[in-house]
Amino acid sequence: MGGLDNFCNDPTAAQKIVLAFSITYTPIMIYALKVSRGRLLGLLHILIFLNCSFTFGYMTYVHFHSTHRVALTLGAVVALLWGVYSLTESWKFITSRCRLCCLGRRYILAPAHHVESAAGLHSISASGNRAYAVRKPGLTSVNGTLVPGLRSLVLGGKRAVKRGVVNLVKYGR
């Protein structure tokens, strides 16, 4: 990597710093994906995509000037696979955020899957873009979460008005 003695005169110093950051912190961010949810998860995917794309580009550039081609090829393949996965997850995150922005100002910081009730916004766990709403006398639950005064249901940034058997507008008001 080099020392600090020739840092100012080295034209590739910025590349080396970014590469050191990518190699050091990308595995930590990948591990943090297991314990993250919501907006933090989306931002982690964006950072991992940027780190993996830089690492992939650097490894393919160095590949042609190195004698350790097998190791660089395997590293580039792993960086490419993680980059593609993080790109798809980042795209899902960005599209759900844009959909929430289109719903209005108060939904900008809302979770992608939530229930709007008389008490405010409640985050719900949804698998994909599906939720199970149960309406009984005096009780409304969405995916096992009790909701007082259900007004609307938002899944993946889209308002679920008439999906499935339940007409949420009818039960909500």
UniProtKB/Swiss-Prot annotation:
Residue spans, topological domain Intravirion: 34-39, 91-173
Keywords: Disulfide bond, Host membrane, Membrane, Transmembrane, Transmembrane helix, Viral envelope protein, Virion
Virion surface side: 1-12, 61-69
GO cellular component terms, semicolon-separated: host cell membrane; membrane; viral envelope; virion membrane
Pfam families linked to this entry: Arteri_Gl
Subcellular location, record wording: Virion membrane; Host membrane
KW Transmembrane (keyword) present: yes
Residue ranges crossing the lipid bilayer per the database entry: 13-33, 40-60, 70-90
Membrane topology: Multi-pass membrane protein
Entry similarity comment: Belongs to the arteriviridae membrane protein family.
Complex and partners: Heterodimer with glycoprotein 5; disulfide-linked. This heterodimerization is required for transport to the Golgi complex.
Function in brief: Major envelope protein.
Protein name: Membrane protein
Organism listed in the record: Porcine reproductive and respiratory syndrome virus (isolate Pig/United States/SD 01-08/2001) (PRRSV)
